[in-house]
Amino acid sequence: MHSWPTPDIPALDGTPVPLALYDTADQQVKPVEVPPSGSGTPVGMYVCGITPYDSTHLGHAATYLAFDLIYRVLLDNDHQVHYVQNITDVDDPLFERAERDGVDWRELGTSQIDLFRKDMETLAVIPPKDYIGAIESIDEVIEMVSTLLEEGAAYVVDDPEYPDVYASINATENFGYESNYDAATMAELFAERGGDPDRPGKRNPMDALLWRAAREGEPSWESPFGPGRPGWHIECSAIATNRLGHSFDIQGGGSDLMFPHHEFSAAHAEAAHGVERMAKHYVHAGMISQDGVKMSKSLGNLEFVHRLTAAGHEPGAIRLGVYAHHYRGDRDWSDEILAAAEARLALWRSAITVATDVQAAVDAVAQLRTHLSNDLDTPAALAAVDAWAEAALKDTGNVSDTADQFDTPEFTPAGRILAAAVDALLGVRL
């Protein structure tokens, strides 16, 4: 499956700063273990993609914008990046939405994937090298499920009508290491987030579905263990390890995926391939709320990217609004946050046309690099650019924070240095 066009990313002078990120499993900020820069071996990064039954809302976008920063900082450090993202294009929510709307589930999925691509391109998100749907990875899933069955890490339930295949929660010794949740929390989240603890025939209520035996009215594919379709978690295990290797560098997504999805995805891969950790670094982005209430389809309070841009809001302002708070924290979105981001964008655009101190711009870029490399500290990074812009305007006596007269700005040499860094590292075009 194709992704979307790659944005132009300026190359920067100066010294980049190696990236450190909070690791969910180890519960600390630590240097990201990656191949040496210039070695020709890419950094392997896997991020869970969408289930394509609705448009891209700010919660989705915030996650992909966080990993876009990671990609950009790695590029600045002269690393190649092999970025893989999946699309869960066969799953219950997709079927349910298609039935509700009276459309074919394939058509719904195709239309929403197209919208997602457009939103990501609009937001200048660097695309994955491999953008892989669950349907196109069916053979890979079947191979991994077969391996787990052969290793005794999975079993078929004793149900002649629906012989589903499940993974044993005891297949790995350190299950739970990624989320660090206690047993009660895991059981609660498993039931809330797509698990089936009461399914008859399971050996343990927490065993996860690997292969759902064919049901009437659902798509299915032939396999050695009967016709059916993939479970949610095994899809990501297979897609990631078939492209990045049995153990790779960075795995991540939204914090709501930490358990059960990421915990089980890692466990399936580790049991199948005999590795201790599927990823060296587990990274999770916080959730977005709307005016203090968590964004939810059921509440109808989603803010969609395409609606914001259709209303005339610039992609750069949307990015700055998301980056106003740290990626790991749950954070709010409001009209006031967007307005503040637009004012910030105008301030920076004013400064790049009048800034004269080249060394000050170089120093600001160094601060920007330092803050982003410190667990993507975007609030500090944006504040550093703010301080540079305010100083530049103060030096010239121009305190205007409106951008009307800067529709086609002529960058000064100092402004050009800063604008290139903001573009390359933050994905914001000035």
Curated annotation (Swiss-Prot):
GO terms for cellular component: cytosol. L-cysteinyl-5'-AMP binds at residues 48-51, 63, 86-88, 232, 254-256, 288. It comes from the Bacteria. A motif ('HIGH' region) lies at residues 50-60. Pfam families: tRNA-synt_1e. The keyword Transmembrane does not apply. The keyword Iron does not apply. One of its GO terms (molecular function) is zinc ion binding. InterPro entries: Cys-tRNA/MSH_ligase (IPR024909), Mycothiol_ligase_MshC (IPR017812), Rossmann-like_a/b/a_fold (IPR014729), tRNA-synt_1_cat_dom (IPR032678). Zn(2+) binds at residues 48, 236, 261. Its EC number is 6.3.1.13. Belongs to the class-I aminoacyl-tRNA synthetase family. MshC subfamily. HAMAP family: MshC. Catalyzes the ATP-dependent condensation of GlcN-Ins and L-cysteine to form L-Cys-GlcN-Ins. Monomer. This is L-cysteine:1D-myo-inositol 2-amino-2-deoxy-alpha-D-glucopyranoside ligase. It comes from Corynebacterium efficiens (strain DSM 44549 / YS-314 / AJ 12310 / JCM 11189 / NBRC 100395).
